[in-house]
Regions:
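Extended, amphipathic alpha-helical coiled-coil scaffold segments used for oligomerization/tethering
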Residues: 30-77
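Short, charge/polar-rich alpha-helical segments
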Residues: 15-30
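Long, charged alpha-helical scaffolding segments
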Residues: 1-19, 61-119
Length: 119
């Protein structure tokens, strides 16, 4: 039982590391999202300014660039959701492992107490 408790604790440590890595990854992706959104907003403003100056060619160019960025933003949002789902799944597994380890330790303690009483 001691060996399996140690193995479970190693699994728990690895799961926590993996979760931390996913969280760092998703934070990085969220920063990408923020930058993309800022660029999209700038292209919207540039488009409005070009329309006011009646420069349709520039306005069309800005709209095209904005749409390309919007597509990247949509892909980024999908990546964030995918990572968030992985994080949630890992957190559930971590909780399950913590409960299982706790039960195993309690059982070990109970058996040790019985052994002491029996002796």
């Amino acid at each position: 039982m001691v060996l399996s408790i140690k193995k479970k604790e190693e699994l728990l440590t690895n799961a926590k590391k993996q979760c931390a890595n996913f969280i760092a990854t998703v934070d990085s992706i969220r920063n990408e999202k923020k930058v993309l959104q800022e660029k999209i907003n700038k292209y919207e403003e540039a488009t409005k300014a070009a329309i006011l100056k009646e420069d349709n060619e520039k306005a069309q160019s800005f709209v095209k660039q904005k749409l390309e960025l919007q597509e990247k933003l949509n892909q980024t949002n999908s990546r964030i959701k995918e990572q968030d789902d992985k994080i949630s799944s890992i957190k559930v597994k971590i909780e399950e492992l913590e409960i299982e380890i706790s039960k195993m330790k309690s059982k070990k303690q109970e058996l040790a107490t019985r052994l002491d009483v029996a002796q």
